[in-house]
Structure formats: structure tokens, C-alpha cells
């Protein structure tokens, strides 16, 4: 399965919520009609079965983090092997992806931008260049940008926006050095309340 490169509003409308696929410069409601599913204008959202709800939640989270189906299932299997609530560990694994950490540190306005930054060898982890977006970042790791990446206008604009909005509690960023520390895996309370990971666990437990 290839990575989706079509209209991001279509995905957000499909799930009926913001998937944070846009830069956030303008409110998403001004771009996407989240209360209407994609398709004919008069089409309404139908009442879904339990399975449908579980599937939609899985698709929503998978698309939010930009992960393919096989990758997502592997994350679930790994989460089930680790100690702790499987749903919470699943989200922590997704949050620990290098592309997501770059996004959380404010070096990119979207996860897709962060993924591109990593793929183009613009990111260093503990002083070494890493071009694998799915790499798991460990607590204590230092993530920074190469000098060439620091000069990109979109990176500078993203970091300026992050300084205005603030950073998550689990990262510590030095904007002057274009680097930050991944302090710890985030607690569940620190993550989006709009994600119902228990539905994903129910789906994969069948």
C-alpha cells in the first residue's frame, strides 16, 4: 500500500475531526467541512456498528500519525508485548517515532513535513544523521537539525509558531540551537482526549 498523497481535507472529513495534517496557520474549519463526509453534499453520516466505530478509530489514529496499515498492526503487536495498558503503550510508541518527535519539537508544522525533513537527512539524533522517520527515539535522546535544515524558511516559521504555542511537557527544546531532548514517553493524560484507543484494542483483540 502506497502512502496517501491526496487532499488532506478529504481524510479529515472522512474521520469527522482534525487529524493535524494541516499547518495550523488557519483554523481547519475554514478549509474543511468536518461536519460533512466526503462525497455528495446531501450525504449524511450513517449510524455505525461497533465494528465500524472501531475501524474508524483505528483509521483516524493511523492517518493522524501517517502510518501504513502493516506498520500500525506491528506497533499494536509490540504494544501488546510491553508492560502497561496496551492502548496507552501503542500511543507512546507512535509518539516516539522520530518524525513525530521532530513535529512535537516544533521543527515542522505537520508530521508529513517532519517526515520529509528526516528523509532528506536534515535531522540528527545524538549527533548522528538519521533518515529513518520510524526510528524509535528513547528518553534522553538529543534531536537536532543540521545547519542546512536550520536555514529553511519553513523550519524557522514552524519553530516561531512553536515558541508562541509552547511545547509538550515531554520534550525540552532550545530554539536557538535548533535542538531538543526527548525527556520521557508522554503520559496518557498528556495526549489527545479525542483518541479512544480502547476501540483499537477491541478491534485487534478479535
Curated annotation (Swiss-Prot):
<dbReference type="InterPro" id="IPR002942">
    <property type="entry name" value="S4_RNA-bd"/>
</dbReference>
<dbReference type="GO" id="GO:0015935">
    <property type="term" value="C:small ribosomal subunit"/>
</dbReference>
<dbReference type="Pfam" id="PF01479">
    <property type="entry name" value="S4"/>
</dbReference>
<comment type="function">
    <text>With S5 and S12 plays an important role in translational accuracy.</text>
</comment>
<dbReference type="InterPro" id="IPR005709">
    <property type="entry name" value="Ribosomal_uS4_bac-type"/>
</dbReference>
<dbReference type="GO" id="GO:0006412">
    <property type="term" value="P:translation"/>
</dbReference>
<comment type="subunit">
    <text>Part of the 30S ribosomal subunit. Contacts protein S5. The interaction surface between S4 and S5 is involved in control of translational fidelity.</text>
</comment>
<keyword id="KW-0694">RNA-binding</keyword>
<dbReference type="InterPro" id="IPR036986">
    <property type="entry name" value="S4_RNA-bd_sf"/>
</dbReference>
<dbReference type="GO" id="GO:0042274">
    <property type="term" value="P:ribosomal small subunit biogenesis"/>
</dbReference>
<dbReference type="Pfam" id="PF00163">
    <property type="entry name" value="Ribosomal_S4"/>
</dbReference>
<keyword id="KW-0689">Ribosomal protein</keyword>
<keyword id="KW-0699">rRNA-binding</keyword>
<feature type="domain" description="S4 RNA-binding">
    <location>
        <begin position="96"/>
        <end position="157"/>
    </location>
</feature>
<keyword id="KW-0687">Ribonucleoprotein</keyword>
<dbReference type="GO" id="GO:0003735">
    <property type="term" value="F:structural constituent of ribosome"/>
</dbReference>
<comment type="similarity">
    <text>Belongs to the universal ribosomal protein uS4 family.</text>
</comment>
<dbReference type="GO" id="GO:0019843">
    <property type="term" value="F:rRNA binding"/>
</dbReference>
<dbReference type="InterPro" id="IPR001912">
    <property type="entry name" value="Ribosomal_uS4_N"/>
</dbReference>
<comment type="function">
    <text>One of the primary rRNA binding proteins, it binds directly to 16S rRNA where it nucleates assembly of the body of the 30S subunit.</text>
</comment>
<dbReference type="InterPro" id="IPR022801">
    <property type="entry name" value="Ribosomal_uS4"/>
</dbReference>
<protein>
    <recommendedName>
        <fullName>Small ribosomal subunit protein uS4</fullName>
    </recommendedName>
</protein>
<dbReference type="InterPro" id="IPR018079">
    <property type="entry name" value="Ribosomal_uS4_CS"/>
</dbReference>
Amino acid at each position: 500500500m502506497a502512502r496517501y498523497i491526496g487532499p488532506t481535507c478529504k481524510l479529515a472529513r472522512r474521520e469527522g475531526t482534525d487529524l493535524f495534517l494541516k499547518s495550523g496557520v488557519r483554523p481547519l474549519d475554514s478549509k474543511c467541512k468536518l461536519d460533512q463526509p466526503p462525497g455528495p453534499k446531501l450525504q449524511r453520516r450513517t449510524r455505525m456498528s461497533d465494528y465500524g466505530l472501531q475501524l474508524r478509530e483505528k483509521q483516524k489514529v493511523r492517518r493522524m500519525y501517517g502510518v501504513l496499515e502493516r506498520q500500525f498492526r506491528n506497533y499494536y503487536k509490540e504494544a501488546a508485548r510491553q508492560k502497561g495498558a496496551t492502548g496507552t503503550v501503542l500511543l507512546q510508541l507512535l509518539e516516539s517515532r522520530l518524525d513525530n518527535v521532530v513535529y512535537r519539537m516544533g521543527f515542522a508544522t505537520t508530521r508529513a513535513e517532519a517526515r520529509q525533513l528526516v528523509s532528506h537527512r536534515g535531522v540528527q539524533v545524538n549527533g548522528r544523521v538519521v533518515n529513518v522517520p520510524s526510528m524509535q527515539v528513547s528518553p534522553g535522546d538529543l534531536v537536532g537539525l543540521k545547519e542546512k535544515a536550520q536555514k529553511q524558511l519553513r523550519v524557522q516559521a514552524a519553530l516561531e509558531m512553536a515558541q508562541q504555542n509552547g511545547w509538550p511537557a515531554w520534550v525540552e527544546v532550545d530554539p536557538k540551537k535548533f535542538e531538543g531532548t526527548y525527556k520521557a514517553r508522554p503520559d496518557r493524560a498528556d495526549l489527545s482526549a479525542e483518541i479512544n484507543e480502547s476501540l483499537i484494542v477491541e478491534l485487534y483483540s478479535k
